[in-house]
């Protein structure tokens, strides 16, 4: 038996494992090869198949039905976590603070929206190039449990909106609720709220 057909199958599989940095970063992920950031395979995957949750971050739920020609522009975002909190930076060049709306909902959703209005054409104007994007933009983020929703602060500088969110102290983070299963003869039990450790 020749080893050549076996090598043709084995070599791509080994390259796939090496590109994904497996098994160091798998950690019980359903998608161990593409779930690890900064790997060759994750970069190739994300270019071809965008993350559906990131796509949903940009879809506004409140678009009116009488606005069929609404234009959504993309606002680029960076989000980092520090020991003290979270910092979200949104590119909003050319906008003033009155053009931007920031909302925090009780279900831990942070929304940033706004509109970049197109310059009105004056009689006699002839555009040679139009590359800047105009229209409404919308980004929303599901905030982690450790964010203090009352601590959100925003500032704008040089076309960048920076949102700062402080972390809750460990004893104030609510853990998952444990629900007991009862049988027909048993009395219903209380719901217990465990603290995250």
Curated annotation (Swiss-Prot):
Residues 68-184 form the sHSP domain. InterPro entries: A-crystallin/Hsp20_dom, CS_dom, HSP20-like_chaperone, Small_HSP. PANTHER family: HEAT-SHOCK PROTEIN 20 FAMILY MEMBER. The keyword Transferase does not apply. The gene is HSP22.7. Residues 1-28 form the signal peptide. Keywords: Endoplasmic reticulum, Signal, Stress response. Forms oligomeric structures. One of its GO terms (biological process) is response to stress. One of its GO terms (cellular component) is endoplasmic reticulum lumen. It is found in: Endoplasmic reticulum lumen. It comes from the Eukaryota. This is 22.7 kDa class IV heat shock protein. The lineage of its organism: Eukaryota, Viridiplantae, Streptophyta, Embryophyta, Tracheophyta. SUPFAM superfamilies: HSP20-like chaperones.
